[in-house]
Amino acid sequence: MSGWQRIYYKLLNLPLQVLVKSKSIPAEPAQELGLDTSRPVMYVLPYNSKADLLTLRAQCLAHDLPDPLEPLEIDGALLPRYVFIHGGPRVFTYYTPKEESIKLFHDYLDLHRNHPDLDVQMVPVSVMFGRSPGREKGEVNPPLRMLNGIQKFFAVSWLGRDSFVRFSPSVSLRRMADEHGTDKIIAQKLARVARMHFARQRLAAVGPRLPARQDLFNKLLASKAIARAVEDEARSKKISHEKAQQNAIALMEEIAANFSYEMIRLTDRILGFTWNRLYQGINVHNAERVRQLAHDGHEIVYVPCHRSHMDYLLLSYVLYHQGLVPPHIAAGINLNFWPAGPIFRRLGAFFIRRTFKGNKLYSTVFREYLGELFSRGYSVEYFVEGGRSRTGRLLDPKTGTLSMTIQAMLRGGTRPITLVPIYIGYEHVMEVGTYAKELRGATKEKESLPQMVRGLSKLRNLGQGYVNFGEPLPLMTYLNQHVPDWREAIDPIEAVRPSWLTPTVNSIAADLMVRINNAGAANAMNLCCTALLASRQRSLTREQLTQQLECYLALLRNVPYSPDATAPSASASELIDHALQMNKFEVEKDTIGDIIILPREQAVLMTYYRNNIAHMLVMPSLLAALVTQHRHLSRAEVLRHVETLYPFLKAELFLRWEKAELAGVVDALIAEMLRQELIVVDGDVMSLNPSHSRSLQLLAAGARETLQRYAITFWLLSANPAINRSSLEKESRTVAQRLSVLHGINAPEFFDKAVFSTLVLTLRDEGYISDTGDAEPEETLKVYRMLADLITSDVRLTIESVTQDDA
């Protein structure tokens, strides 16, 4: 680069340093994209822009990537390290280098022909200033928005702080040369493929153009399904057609989002400021999956777990900062209060009632609106649990919106729909105190402005946040595998309900819950809470707590729950220091050392965080319980216990393994527990290691309350085989409440109605209860005896005294 060019770029860079604050996607491009900086790297940009080039340069230097302004020297030849696909418009159009990119591609390919050891990594990069999709009427939205110098100046001035540099996976020019040749035609194809790549990338980042709201309503009103529903409304309520149509429009006003890019920008600024003060970090994993789906043209439906009202904002914020379009979000109608409702609506929220029953017009309007979102190509987000979890565990899925998603596919004409499960985790949930009150019987407080202000005023240090993207579920692939003739049900007008729809939706919903849990995130708070709640007095010395966290961490790292699950990289001591900063625990100091205490009033609240990762530790906890209670146990006996109890654990906690996989899981966990010296193995028999009995007992406590719950139900069933399912659920809850009082069990989910409902359903599915409702007394008594050996004698006596008291 000549001296004059250096001066030119330095002068041009001065205003950019002030105006532009760009973000790199991914955050660590070399690491996440597997770039080898020891090999030559060249950058491909969509169009000629020095502002884009200098913005790219700033990110390259910040991430130790080669400087795009430094040319590549190959065998004495100097070649630019960057290529512009389009020359781009200028204020004066007398010069447009149309063939420049093709010539450079050809030069690079030609060098590979002459140098067999050469392998240049070609990295496509898009630099975007602003992401407004524009409106449908009167605007054009080309695949590559090329701006002349003056337009670019205003874009950078206004949108420089809302810019990002998106690095794509590199392409090996060696592979291109070897597989396709090096002539000019290949260079032209390479340029054409690059143009298509950037067009798709822009659509993924910006999304389709937005319709005028009234135009959208007019289109919905003109649909045959809503027109028929309006006629039915007029006839059934004996009102005029105009009045029925007004009712339909009112429902559209109630439901529909009013997406605003300017509101997204403003909220991003506010949230960025807020997150930096409330959170110590937002940890995002596997986002590249979603970026690839968006790039490949999939219709994405985000399906996160629901912990908090914060979920709406956090996920949209994360997606926006991953270079993706924030989705249209299905929000409960309870959030449609001033001023939150109008704000959420402009951020993409569309509102949904708790029930559709008895209102055909509403269900038709909602279904048609959802179908229109899909047909226009907008990403959508909804919470398949239906509401926020009050216990920290996943709730049983509500399948209404999921069913409508599949019905939208049965209309035909939509892009391939892919469901993306998402695990959201927090070290502090602002509503957790309210959840505990509601579980104790308090009436749910209606969402309102005063409640929102009170909640916001209490926000302090929220620790870390976690957003883990799970394994995507492509709907078309799933239907092709499980319902091969599903296309026969396609009807472009009517919402069809083929016989296979309900069982298929239920199966997909259960699969999604498993995939959400597969992406679980262990953190300092839920690990410390798990250990402290496992101790009888909710307190451990710092040394004991450190040892127990080391045990959990080794299990999670060496025998990971799933490939998508994450465990902290920090040491146990560092995690404890971090957890203490959250001000949830008390520390008593004496001459020997620190004692870390979970105060009684905090214990119930902290079960929420323990439950977030209960599924990740329940299997090692069950094995630990077997060893601590039996002292000596053969592998075959362990496997028999596990195979008997696993169906109930799987249904309750949405565990991932099938029965055939259990032997391998058990062997891997036994090997890890042996490595940690928690157990001793002699031939085929495993025994407790007395020198590590405390760690094993604390690990076993993770399954203690679950096993007690199962023991209650199996005892009631064996004592009264003719008991009906409803009575079994009710009596099980009553005994569980009694047990919690007598034995100091502070977990609200211990007597949760939904937990016992799932347990009783699984009893039927596993054949312990016949279709007529009677139990199999021999089988139920056999399982009860197995469970009775795994719980303490005082708890067992309390359970067995119930029927004796009744007698």
From Swiss-Prot:
Keyword Transferase: yes
UniProt subcellular location: Cell inner membrane
Enzyme category, top tier: transferase
Membrane topology: Peripheral membrane protein
Principal subcellular localisation of the protein: membrane
Pathway connected to this protein: Phospholipid metabolism; CDP-diacylglycerol biosynthesis; CDP-diacylglycerol from sn-glycerol 3-phosphate: step 1/3
GO cellular component terms, A-Z: plasma membrane
Motif HXXXXD motif location, chain numbering: 305-310
Free-text note on domains in this protein's UniProt record: The HXXXXD motif is essential for acyltransferase activity and may constitute the binding site for the phosphate moiety of the glycerol-3-phosphate.
PANTHER family in UniProt: DIHYDROXYACETONE PHOSPHATE ACYLTRANSFERASE, GLYCEROL-3-PHOSPHATE ACYLTRANSFERASE
Protein name: Glycerol-3-phosphate acyltransferase
Organism, scientific name: Klebsiella pneumoniae subsp. pneumoniae (strain ATCC 700721 / MGH 78578)
Lineage: Bacteria, Pseudomonadati, Pseudomonadota, Gammaproteobacteria, Enterobacterales
Gene field: plsB
